[in-house]
Amino acid sequence: MEESRADGRNPNQLRPFSCTRNPLDRAHGSARWAQGDTIVLAAVYGPKPGTRKGENPEKASIEVVWKPMTGQIGKQEKEYEMTLKRTLQSICLLTVHPNTTTSVILQVVGNDGSLLPCAINACCAALVFAGIPLKHLAVAIGCGVLEDGEVILDTNKAEEQQLKSFAHLVFPNSRKSASSKEPNQKEEDSERGLITSITHGVMSEEDYFSCIERGLAASSRISDFMRTTLQKQAPGDV
């Protein structure tokens, strides 16, 4: 029998999700994504003409700015920006608007654990609401490994203090299937990959693959929620 966590969830249970479309009027698209008490606002501006020095002018550029709840941005937040930029570049169709820059601004509203996955999910929704061309949707989930080897999903902040290691995983989810009840075989195959994988702490190969297996199984629940949300709130964009 699986033991309950301090908040009453079982190891595979995710916190409640919510997503609000375009809470920020001045952005081209925005989303407020919440997982329990972890809340992130993502705002998309662009595409705007021109790219920064060092960027490929034959493709669109993605710029990410992370704003913490309080204080100045630090090393961890800079790492979040880099991870988000790489992740978003991998899901956006960068050849559609060459020599342009799309800015994604993230504001942390609440942090009760699994902050980076929450931010990635917020970004994905905001990009859709802004009408940015995507190869596919993406869903992110946090997986924690306890000292006894137990894997728990969507960790809160208190749990993160007790982890031996953790993995933040981003899985692709066919963009086309967001408006399709039954994705075809090619789309189903594309959902089995891994876009981004960030690990921290001492993690064995067995623990890592256990995180991937459990995370992939749980990601379908986030995918279903995201599809339903996008169909309901912006049927023309998905």
Curated annotation (Swiss-Prot):
Cysteine disulfide links: none
Region (Disordered): 174-194
Top class in the EC scheme: hydrolase
Superkingdom classification of source: Eukaryota
GO CC aspect terms: cytoplasmic exosome (RNase complex); nuclear exosome (RNase complex); nucleolus
Effect of E160Q: Strongly reduces DNase activity
Functional note: Probable component of the exosome 3'->5' exoribonuclease complex, a complex that degrades inherently unstable mRNAs containing AU-rich elements (AREs) within their 3'-untranslated regions. May form a homodimer separately from exosome complexes and function in DNA cleavage process. Binds double-stranded DNA (dsDNA) and single-stranded RNA (ssRNA), and possesses hydrolytic DNase and phosphorolytic RNase activities in vitro.
Protein name, per record: Exosome complex exonuclease RRP46 homolog
Annotated source species: Oryza sativa subsp. japonica
Gene of this entry: RRP46
